[in-house]
Amino acid sequence: MTTEELYDKLKLIQKMKCETQNLELKSAEQGYPKRLYDSLSSFSNQDDGGIIVFGIDEKQDYKEVGVYDAQDIQKKINEQCLQMNPVVRPLITVVEKENKKFVSAEIPGIDLADRPCYYQGRGRLKGSYTRIGDSDEPMTEYEIYSYEAYRRKYQDDIREVPRVTLMSLDQEELNRYVELLKRGKRRLATLDNESIYELMSIKRGEKVTLSATLLFSPYPQAYFPQLCITAIVIPGRTIGSLGDMGERFSDNQRIEGTIPEMLDEALLFVKRNMRTKTIISPTTGRRTDRTDYPITAVREAIINALVHRDYSIHTEGMPIQLIMFEDRIEIHNPGGLYGRITIDQLGKIQPDTRNPVLASALETLGITENRYSGIPTIRMEMEKYNLRQPEFLDERGSFIVKLYKESKNDYEDMSNDEETNNLIVFCKTPRTRKEICDYLGLNS
């Protein structure tokens, strides 16, 4: 940044009096900070990078104390950056204000294929960090694996399942799938079934793949008990709410079977637990039945979870969660977003596919289109129902879809309240409790 930009940043810090997702503050009045590699790592591992400002003391109400030696700090910043893998290349700026010197180090986000950036002195597993609000948190083993899986193009949907044999699969369903594969594919139609099994990743060598197990096994959960859907209905708006009889769940079901079977059962669960209104048109007198949520949107959200969840060994113990609250439906999908796509880009660009073989097989079976139309369809269906637009959240190791029962007009009326709207914008960046309390002028 330029010196003018750093002066502006110092003014903003005095106004906000907090660190943020992209800002770390260090005093450095009495000497160089004991550790910096956690911030170097976490900023490098996010798209927008981050800025470290030296000369601000949080413990003295963000007082501008200045640094002990601007020249030495620059040298030590560079030394620590060289100890990172990949090496971090900071952009350093120095300014003087009221006879005190302040130093900033801009840390650029590195390419997704090069992540995680970690401190070599602690190794990849212990030296990799991610930024959560104003905190640098150690990456989980799964978060580190997810970067490696993308970089090396792991295909967990076709990993081998040792206990499953070809003959243990549902032969009728398997044969139907092979016949569907052959339609319109002249060259494929000339091959024998054994060749097709290998070519289309139904098996690898003598081992059946995970995709084939999830699609054609009579009972996939015999091998992977948690590759299922846990569906619950909460009698309130938060988990922990109790019903009139003290019940925690109004309905509770473990949904198992093949992927097509789980999709059908999940839809039945949702239909069973939402209201259907009967509307009589005042002009035509015709009757129309209207459910709380558009079924097409619910179906797309569930099939997206089943197709795009992470199927690696790190998440095979985590089921998809389908939670129906009083005011919304939430679908929690193990794995988070895959590849380079961000939340803001969902439905606008073609994403990387985490499970390409599984997605292609479900397209052949007529379960999904595999044309990246799921998110736009969900949004369009909610719009048709005049409901609030869905929310998509990418949290640590989890992707969440929220479908709201609230009408679009009611939500927009609330959103037009300037104070509420400003708070929503402020919280789009992950914030700590202290940041939110400071913003609202409350005691933490």
Which residues fall in each region the model found?
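Conserved N-terminal catalytic/coupling substructures associated with nucleotide/phosphate chemistry
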Residues: 1-297, 302-408, 431-437, 442
